[in-house]
């Protein structure tokens, strides 16, 4: 499978938003090997659908590969399902996935070339029941302010040491950049499990990117008497600090192309997490009386009759800033209920959000102890793995944004959620909502997870919403989640690989937490 918008050429993607007759999800990606894998007809012009075959019985989602033969330049490829256009790409071949309801469907791939010739191929497929229906519960838990390189920059070595010599875009240890004093600093292993804050603000984040050079994280770091040169931006952790997370990600599914939604701090990203847009906001702006009125994923679930619950751990309840809270506060309950609810699968809601524990310092945010935070995550997930609900659940663990910590991969291009421009002030750096934020850690945990899996497809936080929408037939919120990958690549529904969860290590909480140890060696 190819990576979305990650194959060295730009593509234009269009997809259907709600309403549509069928539940359809397209992963917009172009494979550089699609044509080679798909022998073309000698007819000029023609479209050849190589996968699936005509008359095939297919799972949902199903893999679709098609190519063209044309003496003129093919400008556009489109997919129609039962006469409804669901996908469009400016390319001469495609390699993507389509989710559909159970039953027989007419699938057409249509091309248009430079002289406006239109030609196509149509096949019939039958989608089987099952697939995503094996997931009766989707749980998402989003911690705070960690970049991919800060937590999982050494995951490639961890995998190689266990016999997996696959590609994993890991932290380049030999890179170096100037700090505020002009000294070159390379990534270094933190000697402390806590450190001072940096800044993931709109301006700092856009400054850090520097046209894709990714070399200004230290320069934008918040002032500190301990680390005045900002070197802590280059610090990282590994399996000796976070053995539970490393093994969890190794055994189940992870990604080296999962991003936050916007180059901005926590609140705009959590707006995307709930509403698939920040409706122009780039700062932690105060909501109006009664909360933000824009619809959230929870409102969409209500309208679709899909049960949900929101578990909070201390007095941190971000949903209280939304009008959804006024209508649905009864669905927001203390985390103690989680440990009993999961042992009654019949009444466990279909969608669950677990709030991070900010007030008690267990959210893994800079300033806080990463080991006590990750140990708390283990407690929550252990309970699920040992419950009756494990067999039918998927648990998605990620972080809201990178926190100003170094990551070497530039943000990716994504669709704008809507027509609302960023609310820029006169001194703000230019930017828009057509790119992601920085990479963040992701682990997808389920008995249906592909074992030892690494995804290289570009996704961001709204892909979690898309997974929920696709699974429970819920309309999308904006164009951003409507065009997001649905994360089904992480699962193998032919068999549950982890009926019994794999053995996982304890997460120690005895590491040294001392801000005085946060600086780079030699500083």
Q: What residue ranges belong to the model's regions?
A:
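N-terminal secretory signal peptides that target proteins for export/translocation
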Residues: 1-13
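Bacterial N-terminal signal peptides
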Residues: 17-28
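Generic leucine side-chain signal with a strong bias for well-ordered alpha-helical environments
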Residues: 23-24, 81, 100, 107, ...
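Bacterial signal peptide processing site
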Residues: 30-32
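Boundary at the C-terminal end of the N-terminal hydrophobic targeting segment
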Residues: 34-36
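Long, low-complexity serine/threonine/glycine- and acidic-rich segments characteristic of extracellular
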Residues: 38-129
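N-terminal pro-sequences and low-complexity stem/linker regions of secreted or lumenal proteins
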Residues: 129-523
């Amino acid at each position: 499978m190819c990576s979305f918008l990650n194959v060295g050429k730009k593509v234009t993607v269009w997809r259907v938003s709600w309403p549509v007759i069928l539940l359809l999800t397209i992963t917009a990606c172009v494979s550089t090997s699609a044509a080679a894998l798909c022998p073309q007809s000698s007819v000029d012009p023609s479209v050849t659908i190589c996968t699936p075959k005509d008359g095939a019985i297919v799972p949902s989602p199903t893999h679709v590969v098609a190519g063209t033969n044309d003496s003129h330049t093919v400008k556009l490829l489109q997919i129609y399902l039962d006469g409804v256009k669901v996908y469009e790409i400016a390319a001469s071949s495609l390699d993507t996935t389509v989710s559909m309801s159970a039953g027989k469907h007419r699938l057409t791939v249509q091309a248009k070339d430079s002289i406006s010739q239109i030609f196509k191929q149509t096949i019939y497929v039958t989608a089987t029941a099952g697939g995503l229906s094996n997931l009766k519960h989707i749980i998402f838990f989003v911690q705070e302010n960690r970049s991919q390189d800060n937590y999982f920059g050494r995951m490639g070595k961890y995998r190689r040491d266990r016999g997996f010599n696959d590609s994993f875009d890991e932290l380049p240890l030999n890179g170096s950049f100037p700090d505020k004093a002009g000294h070159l600093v390379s990534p270094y292993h933190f000697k402390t499990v806590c450190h001072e804050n940096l800044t993931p603000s709109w301006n700092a984040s856009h400054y850090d990117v520097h046209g894709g050079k990714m070399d200004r994280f230290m320069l934008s770091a918040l002032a500190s008497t301990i680390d005045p040169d900002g070197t802590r931006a280059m610090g990282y952790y590994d399996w000796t600090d976070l053995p539970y997370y490393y093994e969890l990600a190794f055994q189940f599914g992870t990604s080296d192309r999962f991003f936050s939604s916007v180059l901005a701090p926590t609140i705009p990203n959590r707006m995307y997490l709930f509403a698939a847009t920040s409706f122009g906001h780039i700062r932690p702006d105060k909501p109006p009386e009664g909360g933000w009125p824009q619809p959230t994923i929870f409102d969409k679930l209500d309208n679709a009759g899909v049960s949900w619950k929101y578990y909070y751990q201390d007095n941190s309840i971000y949903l209280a800033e939304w009008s959804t809270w006024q209508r649905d506060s009864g669905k927001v309950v203390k985390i103690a209920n989680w440990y009993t609810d999961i042992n009654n699968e019949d009444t466990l809601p279909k969608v669950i959000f677990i709030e991070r524990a900010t007030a008690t310092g267990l959210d893994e945010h800079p300033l806080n102890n990463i080991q006590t935070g990750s140990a708390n995550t283990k407690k929550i997930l252990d309970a699920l793995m040992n419950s009756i609900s494990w067999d039918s659940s998927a648990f998605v663990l990620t972080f809201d944004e990178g926190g100003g910590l170094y990551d070497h991969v530039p943000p990716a291009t994504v669709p704008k959620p809507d027509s609302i421009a960023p609310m820029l002030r006169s001194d703000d750096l230019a930017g828009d909502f057509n790119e992601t934020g920085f990479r963040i850690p992701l682990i997808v945990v389920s008995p249906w997870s592909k074992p030892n899996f690494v995804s290289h497809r570009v996704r961001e936080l709204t892909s979690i919403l898309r997974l929920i929408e696709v699974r429970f037939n819920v309309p999308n919120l904006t164009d951003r989640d409507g065009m997001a990958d649905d994360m089904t690549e992480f699962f193998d529904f032919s068999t549950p690989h982890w009926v019994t969860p794999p053995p996982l290590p304890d997460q120690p909480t005895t590491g040294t937490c001392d801000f005085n140890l946060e600086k780079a060696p030699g500083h």
